[in-house]
Regions:
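Short beta-strands and strand-loop turn motifs
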Residues: 102-104, 128-135, 163, 181-186
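Conserved phosphate-binding/catalytic loop of the ribokinase/pfkB sugar-kinase fold
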Residues: 83, 94-127
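Substrate-binding N-lobe of the ribokinase-like
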Residues: 27-87
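Positively charged, low-complexity intrinsically disordered leader regions
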Residues: 1-23, 32
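Conserved phosphate/ATP/ADP-binding segment of small-molecule kinases
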Residues: 147-233
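Gly/Ala-rich phosphate-binding loop of Rossmann-like dinucleotide-binding domains
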Residues: 47, 154, 264
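Conserved phosphate-binding/catalytic region of the ribokinase-like
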Residues: 198-303
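Hydrophobic anchor at the start of a short beta-strand
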Residues: 2, 51-54, 78-79, 160, ...
Length: 303
């Protein structure tokens, strides 16, 4: 089982239009409503790839109830903690022909008693399961939370994936997470540097591996991605077709899901990376997240 935690889920209200006129009344030709949050995205794409997954995290109010219904609609099991007397957030995404605009709400305050409930749920995770920690954390949650979770689970044989940046990520490295996936910009911020090619990215991936990470993926947008695996082997992969890209939200999450599913299927890191890139590209060519058909079509580019 692959568990994901989304600390601040949302309903994403997506509006697709040709040209947003600021300060004017705009009429939308088409709207979509989807569940949002990095962990939720990972779980949905995992399920698309026929992997068993459970989405965890915090929801609140009628918006939270709708988030859970939407997630379950994709066949994902849920084990959310319900926050009283508040509401989960609604985010607005505006997709124009040449740009995207996002308005992300703050979300509910998470009291300590709910954090303790999460820790109790995590005790039920079994050896050989996986846990994905992704994204930022909302009000009320310390930026030590990922480190604390890793510490509590360190004596179990669990694959922990961390898809975050800054201190949230760096504090987990001493617990040797199975996989981390900073993107190029996040890697540059961590090391206060500028990265221009894949070889440079691999040099800094090695530094993260030396700090404890087992496998390091660096996603590099239109340049593709690189992987430094736990055995010291490196892989470089070019981006697939990006000319049809209409949406970047969830692409990184799809890469994580594709990699985990690919390694489960093939027990091969190169093929896992290919699956990750195929899934990420499929999401960029979709209004929401990747479909199995688009992922399989993209995989043909690697044969």
């Amino acid at each position: 089982m692959i568990y994901t935690i989304t600390f601040n889920p949302a309903l994403d209200y997506v509006i697709k239009m040709q040209n947003l006129k600021i300060g004017k009344i705009n009429k939308s030709p088409k709207e979509y409503i989807y569940p949002g949050g990095k962990g939720i995205n990972v779980s949905i794409v995992l399920k698309v790839l026929e992997q068993e997954t459970t989405a965890m995290g915090f929801i609140s109010g009628f918006v939270g109830e709708e988030i859970e219904k939407q997630v379950q609609k994709y066949g994902v099991k849920t084990d959310f903690i319900k926050i009283e007397n508040d509401n989960s957030r609604i985010n607005i995404k505006i997709l124009e022909e040449t740009q995207e605009t996002a308005i992300n709400a703050k979300g509910p305050y998470i009291e300590e008693k709910y954090i303790e409930l999460l820790y109790k749920k995590l005790e039920r995770i079994e050896d050989k399961d996986s846990l994905v920690l992704s994204g930022s954390v909302p009000n009320g949650i310390s930026n030590n939370i990922y480190e604390t979770i890793c510490q509590k689970l360190k004596n179990k044989n669990i694959k922990i994936v961390v898809d975050s940046t800054g201190e949230l990520l760096l504090k987990t490295l001493k617990y040797k997470p199975y996989l981390i996936k900073p993107n190029q910009q996040e890697l540059e911020e961590i090391f206060n540097t500028k990265i221009v090619n894949k070889d440079q990215a691999l040099e800094y991936a090695k530094k993260l591996q030396e700090k404890g990470a087992q496998n390091v993926i660096i996603s590099m947008g239109s340049k593709g991605a690189v992987l430094l695996d736990e055995n010291g082997y490196s892989y470089k992969i070019n981006a697939l077709n990006t000319k049809d890209a209409i949406n970047t939200v969830g692409a990184g999450d799809s890469m994580v899901a594709g990699f985990l599913a690919g390694h489960e299927m093939f027990n091969n890191y190169e093929k896992a990376l290919q699956m990750g890139v195929a899934a990420a590209t499929a999401t960029t060519n979709s209004i929401f997240l990747a479909t199995k058909e688009k992922i399989e079509e993209n995989l043909k580019n690697f044969k």
